[in-house]
Amino acid sequence: MWVVPGAPLEQGAGWRIWYSQDGDADFRPQPVTVAKSQQPQPIDEEWNLLARLPEFHRRIGVLTVRLRQPDPAGPVYELSVPEAERGAPFRWRSLPAGVGQEGVTFLLASCFWRDDDKEGSYTAGVQELTRRWSPAFKLLAGDQLYADWPIGNTDLPAVEFYASRYAEYWGDALYRELLQTSPTFFVCDDHEFWNDFPERQIQVPRTWLPAERKITAQAGLDLYDRFQGCANPAPFRWYGFRIDPVSFFVVDSRSRRDPFNKQPRPPHFLPEEQWQDLERWVHQLTGPGVLLIGQPAFQKDGDWRDHSLSNFPEDYGRLWAVIEESLEGHTADGRPHDILVLSGDIHTGRFAVGRRGGLDAPEGVPELIASPASMIRPGSKEVEEPDYRFTVHHRGRATTWQVDRNPAAGVPFMTLANNVAAVRMGLGTNGRIRFELTLWQVRPYDSRSWWERFTGDPAPVGPVIELFRKEIELR
């Protein structure tokens, strides 16, 4: 039995716990017991067993555990889950209702290529950061597995292929230990399916023909929904949650992305219903917003090998218009509220700040990227710099943004080290929220050549160390 915590419930109400059992038979997990400071806590449970998927011979379900007497402060609870086969209970926080004197910490990570980290450096790093920071949750920002690399057995039916790749990752006890460190919010990016999804890729034979590409895409989506999406808040692929006064919105810019073809209409990276949810979220802000998106906002145009958000000019302009709406005060309380952007994808840990003339936004638009947790091979040899100046268009209006650049001062910060971010939110001055942003090395960058690898030169090793720290106060 595989057991992984999903997203916590808002207002400290409890948790979602994901289960997967081998075979086709129905099942229901044994009751969970919950304690706080070793005192038993009354709970209610709701079990949702997902429908069988043809050619997939595992059953998956989500157990919702609700505290009858929730503590809005988000303390640590001890959860005993019999199927997890642990000698000790899990120690998970509930989701705080608000940012208080103690603050709230969460982790951010993306891009885990297991083939280069089977020894578990990523797991050990997250375990160490969990001991240091006691995070309330973690945000996994995409590419939680690489379904497309290595290519694998191309003779397997699509569902069996994706199931086998998830079994390599979720079936790895070390990776499950990482997932079990704290409750988890998931969002997908391309490698849950294949590179630059939904585009045809020369190195992925399953994508060459339209009919097979459609079958493969549906299989990838079905397995993503079962292994990751079903453990999120509704509507599962994109969603929001709140830790008052901070509001989070998790954007899925991948699973419903249009193929990149400007005819007969411009392509989109978000469906209209997600746009409406995102715009409604901005208009309901009463404090800082945190926007998690699988690809960075400050990114140069990609090409046929890998498209960026900026390759979709209509949606890219609309995204920046949404951010401007918040900074201009088109919010629930009529005040301007800052947006912190979080992302992954680019195999560079990075912090950058964008600014637009005429906006009263002292902190600009800060963007923190945690990537990669484990670098794919062949991997990046140079850091991925942001687009330092770009113009977007929305409803006939052009706006130009500039990203702060001062190489002598290390601005923007960039690293190739395998990394994880920790973000701590606390009370700031004048009603603002202080965000302490840090990036941590979980494994050094491996710069060995193919020959050095072939001849057995050892991979670099190193401790968990802080690479970057920045404090900002957001309205």
Question: Where in this protein do the model-derived segments appear?
Answer:
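Metal-dependent phosphoester/phosphodiester hydrolase catalytic core
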Residues: M1-R475
